[in-house]
């Protein structure tokens, strides 16, 4: 595909485009983040993504996939009553890092710090100084490898992780 082709747009409540990005800009930022994740030796390791909807989530999700890690998606806690769900997910999936955006990181850090004795790094991915993507190399993977985990709501019991492979 052409890097200048349309990649993704975000709309406001009226259906008007508020942000739009090309495939090239999405891929470049995702590759850069993928290179950053190499310090975690990411192959098959889980990264918990705690983002609001938007570009930061898309780039982090793709960055984890490009690094051969496993993205674990969850809504960030809106208030203290949602902390037990996040704790349950963290305990179940044992992520190597918690990823979020700069505007959520302080709130999440405050909520989670005392809850689980969290020793996992909380990384605001849109606030990193990332290297150029020119050193990025495609990683091979099997279609049967797990791409991401999607957790159930946990409304009737602890959230359960559903494994989604690259083939799905």
Where would I find each of the regions flagged by the language model?
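Conserved AMP-binding/adenylate-forming core of the ANL superfamily
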Residues: 8-58, 78-87, 133-140, 164-167
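Conserved pre-ATP/AMP-binding loop-to-beta segment of ANL
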Residues: 3-6, 123-124, 132-158, 163, ...
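Internal alpha/beta domain cores that form substrate/cofactor-binding pockets in large enzymes
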Residues: 108-121
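A general structural motif
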Residues: 3-5, 43-44, 95, 119, ...
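Conserved ATP-dependent adenylate/AMP-binding module captured primarily in the ANL superfamily
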Residues: 76-111, 131-133
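AMP-binding/adenylate-forming
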Residues: 70-72, 87-102, 147-149, 163-168
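A short helix-loop-beta submotif of the ANL/AMP-binding
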Residues: 47, 54-77, 88, 92-97
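Short beta-strand elements of ligand-binding domains
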Residues: 51, 75, 119-130
């Amino acid at each position: 595909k052409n890097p200048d082709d349309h990649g993704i747009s975000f709309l406001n409540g009226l259906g008007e485009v508020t942000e739009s990005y090309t495939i090239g800009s999405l891929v470049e930022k995702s590759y850069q983040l993928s290179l950053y994740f190499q310090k975690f030796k990411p192959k098959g390791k889980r990264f918990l993504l705690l983002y609001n909807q938007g570009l930061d989530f898309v780039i982090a999700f793709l960055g984890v996939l490009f690094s051969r890690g496993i993205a674990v998606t969850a809504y960030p806690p809106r208030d203290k009553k949602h902390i037990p769900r996040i704790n349950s997910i963290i305990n179940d999936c044992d992520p190597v890092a918690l990823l979020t955006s700069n505007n959520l990181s302080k709130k999440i850090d405050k909520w989670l710090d005392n809850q689980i004795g969290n020793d996992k790094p909380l990384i605001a991915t849109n606030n990193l100084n990332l290297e150029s993507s020119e050193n990025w190399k495609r990683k091979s993977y099997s279609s049967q490898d797990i791409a991401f985990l999607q957790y159930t709501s946990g409304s009737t019991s602890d959230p359960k992780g559903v494994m989604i492979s690259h083939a799905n």
